[in-house]
Amino acid sequence: MYVWGRLARMMATASRRGPYAVGSESRLAFRCLPTDIDFNSHLNNARYMMLADLGRIDIFLRVGLIALARRQGWAPMIGGLESVYVREIRLWRRFEVVSSIETWEGTQVIGRHRFVLDNGETAALIMTTGGVYDRPSRRFVDIDQVVAALGRSVRPRPPTEAERTFMTSHQGLRSLAKQTA
């Protein structure tokens, strides 16, 4: 099942997983297929990013962000990511992508995607930063405003030292990219 098939399956089963509560996890089960592997017969690097996308979309659907974004003219966007691979996911191996919204600050949201093998070991971890872009206003929306528009009254926890380091690194790399553009 390639990207579109996995996306369709995730969307068709989202209601069975119930509403997403900030602070909880999205868990999507997969098997490493022949279309997922590289020449080492394990999940290729690009596939990790695509599967993390599915975890994010699952959260966005279940929290109501997709519907809200369409009404408001907003667009959820990823700004960057950092990944680390600690175990390989071999062909035919079962695994889960466990995704969560960790915290936010201003217009920036930190997400986490763990790739968990069927024996409970973490195979990879991806941290993401993103935001919600207001197309009509041509600006990013403060995440507290997004949370309020979703009818939630959740406050973010302070970023951990690792998350703060990631945010700072991302901002530095983003500045570098804008200089060379």
Question: Can you describe what each PLM-predicted range is?
Answer:
Residues 36-38:
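Acidic, divalent-cation-chelating loop motifs in proteins
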Residues 1-16, 22, 89-96, 100-181:
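HotDog/MaoC-like acyl-thioester-processing domains
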